[in-house]
Regions:
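Glycine-rich phosphate/ribose-binding loops and adjacent secondary-structure elements
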Residues: 365-367, 461, 468-476, 480, ...
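Long, charged amphipathic helices and adjacent flexible linkers at domain junctions
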Residues: 70-73, 238, 400-453, 458-461, ...
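Flexible, glycine/threonine-enriched loop-and-boundary segments that flank and lead into catalytic domains
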Residues: 231-269, 438, 446-448, 455-456, ...
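Conserved alpha/beta-domain cores
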Residues: 99-100, 553, 563-909
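Nucleotide/phosphate-binding sheet-loop regions of phosphoryl- and nucleotidyl-transfer enzymes
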Residues: 1-424, 458-461, 468-473, 479, ...
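C-terminal accessory/binding modules appended to enzymatic or scaffolding proteins
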Residues: 14-22, 434-477, 843-859
Length: 909
């Protein structure tokens, strides 16, 4: 492979690469090349390609060095020619930086080395050439420390130990009686270099390398090695960056911001990364190296006068003190500022996105070290995209694709005040199950959440080992939910997301004692009534009350949603069980209800007694009496839903969970039911025990209930049809779709459809009127997917219940997966939680097969998805490619799904 080009040079407004070569040169290398080509002042250098990273892991360090040597030596000569300095020279030594750069930005995840090329001879030459020995020795000290850490592995022996270099620095400062690194003299710095080298020799058994070429090869290989360090691996997992991409290595001539009062270093953004405002902003430090800006050793100053004045006001600093002690770059170096401002404008217009730029001013000359598309908040993301669309920088399609669907979550939920969160005490961390911020007093039981709200008007934090459907009302009345057990798709997580309610689940360190009503965690004891705060976006739980603020859904958000609707070809519905849920979903742009779970209605108010009367009855007659009480309640619920959706389709799922979920479990409830039904307490206890199942998720539930107790299906069908006809009579169009759950055999579905059709015809005869309705099924049993051609003979639509379909296909319990999921992710057995991200190769194949077979029988068959995957962007993309008509998700995930559907359509084109 001798003809393969592995090194690309840049400098003096020329480059062998360009900005489109991100896969080969990484984001940093591609942008450095592109900045050269458009005339931006960039220190010369070269980039070693990402392909060499793969060779490093397949061929080994020594082989890669030999392969690279000719090209790297030639590229270094190019830097020497452009700078007038020579690598390893005793008079005019060239110093370089060595940095990583993957195709996707991974800030801070991999290692960087500055001032490479320094040795005992070079430091004297630099001191003589600059007339600044302190600068020279400080640069040497920094290099030995950085190289020792990154390349030579000079780490603390144990986690309790201090960094070996920092320990030496602290000892030197104590010896000299000073507090800051900047107070150390030239002689102090010389002593530090000697001590650093001695520490390297003692810990590694090797001398610190003096040869610049040995230093360079060590650094290049260390950067490749850092691609597989723990933090880089974790970052890639969190951001879905494939390990096979690899990293490039960029080697650049050093420029120094710490050469005196006419030098500086800084970081800037072409727009505000927090708000999206079109305001140039950033920070800089005079006479400093890049790391000093973020190290907090000195107070960085603002680049613009406006920014400087805003900062001073926030710090209660007078204008007089600001101007004298913390002036802006514009005031200190007006000519350089003007050039920097012109460059940031040029870069933003050229790259057509908000830019994050790093710069150094060396002796009055401005150099750009990096530019990249800046990271931003969800609010800033939307504002920048819509502003750039209005400014004519980008078109509609680019504006839509520029906005990440998952980041919309940040706009839809309350958030913590940024200042308050910095001072908050984290007591435990769980799973970020539902985004948002919540603060309130702790309660342990659902009824107490209701009670606290009713008596004080204050919403509480409901803390449970795990939640159940009976906790629904309490969850609704709570500010947030915290559970010790359960994953991202546990009951608490799913219901909380549907409510737009903040939730942290699976906080396994919590020791919850219901009897004493206390939580013990990490040395803290929290009692009922004590305040805690939940961060549903990070999973962190804070002690006490942390201030929150409402998220602002601006006009830009609405405009983005309009554009998403314009380009998406797949519809988005919502999973909604109440008129309030439906109204919220409609406000977010849902085009129907893809799942209304009728059982959630059974837990409200006095209804639960009627439900319990029905399940505890010994015969059909008794069940029918109880169902007669439920009929008007269910009918009223459906009327509210149909009205809220204003003519959009509504899928109502018939009763799905096993009956034991509704059973009275406490002695108080059981005695109450005995009195209501006129039977003995012992009879109630016996019936509850009879209802208990060993494996209820695969037991007497779904269509199996409707087929063994047809009167349940009859009542629900009547409630649905009558409600639809009542709403139709008010002039509102109604599109009813009745869904039969847990079908695995077409005969099960046919039996249920016959009941529904019979009841519908009875109601039509009674009313002397008709409505259109459809009967379909939930595909959640694998057998239904592989026999979809038979199922479609009966079903008029399919809705994939991917929560249960995932459970039954993978054999994973979604409530217990948290026990082994982290290990499976770490070992790369699974790439993602299959209950969050659809398993395309397994569950996805069943979906594709069912769609294909179903439409083979019934070409016009409408297919959708109603599991939690319906709101996850990559799963929405899969649904688009699989040919589904719609996805359905929690109301607060509707905007995310709409944007993801638009992305899928645009990316396919």
């Amino acid at each position: 492979m001798a003809d393969v080009k592995r090194v690309y040079t840049f400098g003096n407004k020329e480059a062998e690469g360009n900005g489109k070569m991100r896969e080969l040169l990484g984001g940093k290398g591609a942008n450095l090349a592109e900045m050269n080509l458009i005339g931006i002042p960039v220190p010369p250098g070269f980039t070693i390609t990402t392909e060499v990273c793969a060779e490093y892991y397949s061929k080994g360090k020594e082989a890669v060095i030999e392969i690279l040597r000719p090209e790297v030596e030639k590229a270094m000569t190019n830097i020497e020619n452009l700078t007038g300095m020579k690598f390893g020279d005793k008079e005019m030594p060239l110093l370089v930086s060595v940095r990583s750069g993957a195709r996707a930005s991974m800030p801070g995840m991999m290692d960087t080395i500055l001032n490479l090329g320094m040795n005992d001879e070079a430091v004297e030459a630099v001191a003589k050439r600059t007339g600044n020995p302190r600068f020279a020795w400080d640069s040497y000290r920094r290099f030995v420390q950085m190289y020792g850490d990154v390349v030579l592995g000079m780490k603390p022996v144990s986690k309790e130990d201090q960094d070996p270099f920092e320990e030496i620095i602290e000892a030197q400062k104590e010896k000299r009686g000073v507090k800051m690194d900047t107070d150390l003299t030239v002689e102090d710095l010389k002593e530090l270099v000697v001590a650093f080298k001695a520490a390297v020799k003692e810990q590694t058994g090797k001398d610190f390398p003096a040869c610049p070429w040995e230093q360079l090869w060590g650094a290049v290989c260390a950067v490749f090695g850092s691609w597989m360090n723990e933090r880089a691996i974790l970052y890639r997992k969190l951001n879905n960056i494939p390990a096979e991409w690899g990293t490039a290595v960029s080697v650049q001539a050093m420029v120094f911001g710490n050469m005196g009062e006419n030098s500086a270093t800084g970081v800037a953004f072409s727009r505000d990364a927090a708000t999206g405002e079109n305001i140039f902003n950033g920070e800089y430090l005079v006479n400093a190296q890049g790391e000093d800006v973020v190290a907090g050793i000195r107070t960085p100053q603002q680049i613009t006068i406006e920014g400087s004045r805003r900062w001073a006001k926030a710090q209660n600093i007078s204008e007089e003190d600001r101007a004298s002690k913390y002036p802006s770059l514009k005031e200190v170096m007006p000519t350089v500022y003007a050039e920097l401002n012109e460059i940031q404008n040029h870069l933003e217009v050229y790259f057509k996105d908000m830019q994050d730029i790093e710069f150094t001013i060396q002796d009055g000359k401005l150099w750009m070290l990096q530019c990249r598309n800046g990271k931003r908040t969800g609010a800033a993301m939307v504002k920048i995209a819509m502003d750039m669309l209005r400014e004519g920088l980008i078109d509609e399609k680019t504006a839509v694709l520029r906005c990440e669907p998952a980041k919309l979550d940040e706009l839809l939920h309350p958030v913590f005040d940024k200042t308050a969160i910095k001072n908050a005490k984290v007591i435990v961390k769980g799973l970020p199950a539902s985004p948002g911020a919540a603060t309130g007093p702790v309660v342990f039981f659902a009824e107490d959440a209701e009670k606290v709200l009713a008596e004080t008007g204050q919403k509480a934090i409901l803390v449970r080992i795990e939640t159940s459907p009976e906790d629904l009302k309490g969850m609704l009345d709570a500010a947030g939910i915290l559970t010790a057990r359960g994953g991202m798709t546990s009951h608490a997580a799913v219901v909380a997301r549907g409510m737009g309610k903040c939730c942290v689940s699976g906080a396994g360190e919590l020791n919850i004692d219901y009897k004493t009503r206390t939580i013990k965690v990490n040395g803290y004891e929290i009692k009922e009534g004590d305040w805690i705060s939940l961060n549903g976006s990070t999973g962190e739980v804070y002690l006490g009350q942390v201030a929150t603020q409402d998220a602002d859904l601006s006009g830009d958000f609405g405009q983005l949603m309009e554009l998403a609707g314009k380009y998406a070809t797949m519809k988005v519905r919502a999973n909604a069980d109440t008129p309030r849920d439906a109204a919220q979903a409609f406000a977010f742009g849902a085009e129907g209800i893809g799942l209304c779970r009728t059982e959630h209605m059974f837990f409200e108010g006095e209804r639960i007694k009627a439900v319990r009367e029905m399940i505890l009855s010994d015969d059909e007659a008794g069940r029918r009496v109880a169902l007669g009480k439920l009929l008007p309640m269910q009918r009223g619920d459906f009327e509210g839903l149909f009205k809220a959706m204003k003519g959009y389709p509504v899928i109502v799922r018939l009763l799905d969970p096993p009956l034991h979920e509704f059973a009275p479990n406490t002695e108080k409830e059981q005695r109450e039911m005995a009195e209501v039904m006129g039977i003995s307490y012992e009879e109630v206890v016996a019936k509850v025990e009879y209802l208990h199942e060993v494996n209820p998720m695969l037991g007497h539930r779904g269509c199996r209930l409707g087929n063994t107790y047809p009167e349940i299906t009859e009542m629900q069908a009547r409630a649905i049809i009558e409600a639809a006809m009542n709403v139709k009579a008010t002039g509102i169009d109604v599109k009813v779709e009745i869904m039969v759950p847990l079908v695995g055999n077409h005969k099960e579905l046919r039996y249920q459809k016959n009941i529904i059709d019979t009841v519908a015809n009875q109601v039509f005869a009674e009313r002397n009127d008709k409505i259109d309705y459809m009967v379909g099924t939930m595909i959640e049993v694998p057998r239904a997917a592989v026999t979809a051609n038979q199922i479609a003979e009966v079903a008029e639509f399919f809705s994939f219940g991917t929560n249960d379909l995932t459970q039954m296909t993978l054999g994973f319990s979604r409530d217990d997966i948290a026990k082994f999921l982290p290990i499976y992710l770490e070992k790369n057995i699974l790439k993602a939680d299959p209950f969050q991200v659809l398993d395309r190769n397994g569950v996805g194949q069943l979906v594709r097969e069912a769609v294909f077979k179903g439409r083979g029988t019934r070409p016009e068959l409408k297919c959708g998805i109603c599991g939690e995957h319906g709101g996850e962007p990559s799963s929405v993309e899969f649904c688009h490619y699989a040919g589904l008509n719609y996805v359905s998700c929690s109301p607060y995930r509707v905007p995310i799904a709409r944007l993801a559907a638009a992305h899928a359509a645009l990316n396919q084109k």
